[in-house]
Curated annotation (Swiss-Prot):
Pfam families for this protein: P-loop_SecA (PF21090), SecA_DEAD (PF07517), SecA_PP_bind (PF01043), SecA_SW (PF07516)
Family: Belongs to the SecA family.
Organism, scientific name: Listeria monocytogenes serovar 1/2a (strain ATCC BAA-679 / EGD-e)
Protein's name according to its UniProt entry: Protein translocase subunit SecA 2
Effect after changing residue 407 to G: In strain: SLCC7510
Known outcome of mutating residue 627 to F: In strain: SLCC7510
Membrane protein topology class: Peripheral membrane protein
Gene (UniProt): secA2
Length: 776
């Protein structure tokens, strides 16, 4: 993307500072390593008591620049230093691929460590985390900064050691899961993650935007009747288009009146929306989503009788990840593979809410400007476009638009064939495995050798990308296209025009298109890019516009079918409009996810704060007597103050509180006593029993029981919130705002959760036996 006025103003301001850093080249040239480490210690100490000035920044950057020159032989250029200064301001730096973001990261991490902050560097996958830790980590270590790699599968001792480092490399999911696991431990000493000071996110658009739709979940197996999925599958397979309505770009499908009648008859229920039919309704809707909204080889792939999610933005399969809330089971039933048990959520957080907990956040990527509004609205981060060190020498052509996919396919083969014959390497980008395999078949038929990269063979990704710049190489890839890895050109390829990139479809996001184009023309290399699309592509097929439908019909009816592309400004405008609308729809989905998660986020913070206090104090924050009194007063009210229809519930609660406990007064006697008298008897008896224990023993017992009950009830509460979220759209569609209903009913569920674990804690207090143990 081009710079706007604000970008140019910021870049101009920092260009002068960057030039001064370069001028300091000789400042540390003659120092030994020990002397450089002394400088590091000097700056660390200084900023414990004093603020950092621009002059300080210049000297610190110059120190890191000298170390990088010695250890990895790279001298940071002015634009890399500008980018690092932008990152230091808590912004997103958009820097073209191949311009040296990895080296740029060194400077902002080093300066944040000098400020006294712990730094987390987040990458898209563990391979990149390991690679960057080895390359830049050695420079930081040369300067006396400790560096660690946060990997999955480590034990608590190993994790604790990692989190003592100044700089930690890892993936978003691993840092997020460490946070969730920390809030499930039973002892303070088992927590591993230290403070969330500063995070630098590589491929920020991928992590903060693309991955934001999938929350992080820690779960276990949930018992349920899996046969319902197979039964519902039979119903949905028989459904006709007249039975349901659908908005595919919003990922929403629902039954119309005919469909409701058919489903009620199938399940044998009077009303599908009655409380008794909630399971049947839920699973029917899940199977409808699986059949009508989730597409094989686009949203998921079936490998070795297992359904694997495909990341829509990279094209990679995601082993171990499952769609939540029963959707994965529905897809398994649809595909006729084993339906595995649904998981029960133990802890969850969205990527958005995890990273918003950091005191400071920065990001770097090759494509972010198109999503600046989202970065600003959700993360309070501006996007600044960093100029390239060398002029981009890639020729970007206007789209070729064809009437049909068949015509497009023929044109792609012709385009690739003549480039192949002259030896120019070509990268063909597709948006799905299905389209990837279709183009591959056309190339095979034309006798053009090529290598294929998609979710089915992602294990060979590094090897395939390494060969993509060789003379005469044709590479066919889904969106992944080796992001994070350079395509290096053979020396004799430059004179052939560099790497040619052919896009076979416009994606839902312009950003993904820019990423594909950015594979070519790196670091001043020559290159070429062009999109070859058709009126039958998914982007236009799902674009809902009456004016477009008329134009499309007119073009298909009147235009000559000679296989040549259509040059129409109107069609180009429609493509851009369709992308913008879908970007807006996807942004709304992510905002919607965040809005719903903010309800849980507030509740989660309250629960985790109470847990932390329990672990810190090693005893209850309030007296057990106070909790017992509140529960008893709530449970024992004069019958005349209770509505007649609630009397049965009232007596049941009393029986549940006292039943099976050591409380010496029988329930028959209790019913003859005044409520206030019962409360005082309960509290005084508990006080007498409690005093029989050593103070430390009873405090430990109460803490353990309270923590255990709170954790158990929290899991049940999360499950209830999931059920509420699923049902709220079904009940509210076309009526009241579902988010408002969710907020209101979610707050009521949270109050119930708090009341429940206090109630069962009070019950446990009345189970204290003479030996100091709690029964049950």
């Amino acid at each position: 993307m081009r710079q706007n006025y604000d970008d140019r103003k910021i870049v101009k301001q920092y260009r002068e500072i960057a030039r001064q850093i370069v001028k300091k080249e000789g400042l540390y040239k003659n120092m030994e390593q020990a002397e450089l480490c002394e400088q590091t210690n000097f700056w660390r100490e200084k900023f414990k008591t004093k603020p950092m000035t621009d002059r300080d920044k210049i000297n610190i950057f110059a120190l890191a620049r000298e170390a990088a020159s010695r250890i990895i032989g790279l001298d940071a250029v002015v634009v890399q230093l500008i980018g690092a200064l932008v990152l230091g301001d808590g912004k997103v730096a958009e820097m073209k691929t191949g311009e040296g973001k990895t080296l740029m990261s060194l400077f902002v991490m080093f300066i944040e460590v000098m400020r006294g902050n712990r730094v987390h560097l987040v990458t898209a996958n563990e391979y990149l985390a390991r690679r960057d830790r080895e390359e830049i980590g050695q420079v930081l270590e040369y300067l006396g900064v400790s560096v660690a790699l946060n990997e999955s599968g480590l034990d608590i001792a190993q994790k604790k050691a990692i989190y003592t480092a100044d700089v930690i490399y890892g993936t978003a999911s691993e840092f997020g899961f460490d946070y969730l696991r920390d809030n499930m431990v039973r002892q303070k000493e088992d927590k591993v993650q230290s403070g969330l000071d500063f995070v630098l996110i590589d491929e920020a658009d991928s992590i903060l935007i693309d991955e934001a739709r999938t929350p992080l979940l820690i779960s276990d197996r949930k018992e349920e009747d899996l046969s319902l999925y197979h039964t519902a599958n039979k119903l949905v397979k028989k459904m006709m288009k007249d039975d349901y309505e659908m908005e595919e770009h919003k990922r929403f499908v629902w039954l119309n009146d005919a469909g409701i009648e058919k489903a009620q008859k199938f399940w044998g229920v009077e009303s599908l929306y009655s409380a008794e039919a909630q399971s049947e309704l839920r699973i029917t809707m899940l199977l409808m989503r699986a059949h009508f909204l989730m597409h094989k080889d686009k949203d998921y792939v079936v490998l070795d009788d297992e359904v694997l999610i495909i990341d829509p933005h990279t094209g990679r399969a995601l082993p171990g990840r499952r769609f939540n809330d029963g959707l994965h089971q529905a897809i398994e039933a649809k595909e006729g593979v084993e339906v595995k048990e649904e998981s029960r959520t133990l802890a969850t957080i969205t990527i958005q809410n995890y990273f918003r907990m950091y005191k400071k956040i920065s990001g770097m990527t090759g494509t972010a400007k198109t999503e600046e509004e989202e970065f600003r609205q959700i993360y309070n981060m501006d996007v600044v476009v960093i100029p390239t060190n060398l002029r981009v020498n890639r020729e970007d052509m206007q789209d070729d638009i064809f009437y049909t996919k068949k015509e497009k396919g023929r044109a792609i083969v012709y385009e690739v064939s003549w480039r192949y014959e002259k030896g120019q390497p070509t990268l063909i980008g597709t948006s799905s495995i299905k389209s990837n395999e279709w183009i591959s078949g056309l190339l095979d038929a034309a006798g053009i050798p090529h290598q294929v990269l998609n979710a089915k063979n992602h294990a060979q990704e590094a090897e395939i990308i390494a060969k993509a710049g060789k003379r005469g190489m044709v590479t066919l890839a889904t969106n992944m296209a080796g992001r994070g890895t350079d395509i290096k050109l053979d020396p004799d390829v430059h004179k052939l025009g560099g790497l040619a990139v052919i896009g076979t479809e416009r994606h839902e996001s312009r950003r993904i298109d820019l990423q594909l184009m950015g594979r070519s023309g790196r670091r001043g290399d020559p290159g070429f890019s062009k999109f070859m699309i058709s009126l039958e592509d998914d982007l236009l097929e799902q674009f809902e516009s009456k004016s477009w439908e008329k134009l499309s019909a007119k073009l298909k009816r009147k235009a000559p079918r000679d296989g040549k592309p259509v040059n129409s400004r109107k069609i180009h405008a429609v493509v851009v409009d369709a992308q913008k609308r879908l970007e807006g729809a996807n942004y709304d989905i992510r905002k919607d996810l965040l809005s719903y998660d903010e309800v849980i986020d507030l509740q989660r913070k309250m629960v985790y704060k109470e847990r932390d206090l329990l672990l810190e104090r090693n005893k209850l924050g309030v007296s057990s007597e106070k909790i017992l009194r509140e529960v008893a007063e709530y449970s024992f009210i004069h019958p005349s103050d209770i509505p007649e229809e609630e009397l049965e519930i009232y007596y049941s609660r009393q029986k549940e509180l006292l039943g099976g406990t050591k409380f010496p007064i029988s329930f028959d006697q209790v019913t003859l006593m005044e409520p206030r008298e019962v409360v005082e008897e309960i509290v005084s008896w508990h006080k007498k029993e409690r005093n029989k224990f050593p103070a430390e023993t009873i405090a430990a017992i109460e803490r353990e029981v309270y923590l255990n009950l709170m954790d158990q009830m929290w899991v049940m509460h999360l499950d209830a919130m999931v059920q509420l979220r699923e049902g709220i759209h079904l009940r509210a569609y076309g009526q009241q705002d579902p988010l408002v209903m969710y907020q209101k009913e979610g707050a009521q569920l949270f109050e119930k959760f708090q009341a429940d674990y206090h109630f069962y804690f009070a019950h446990a207090l009345l189970e204290l036996d003479p030996d100091g143990l709690i029964q049950g």
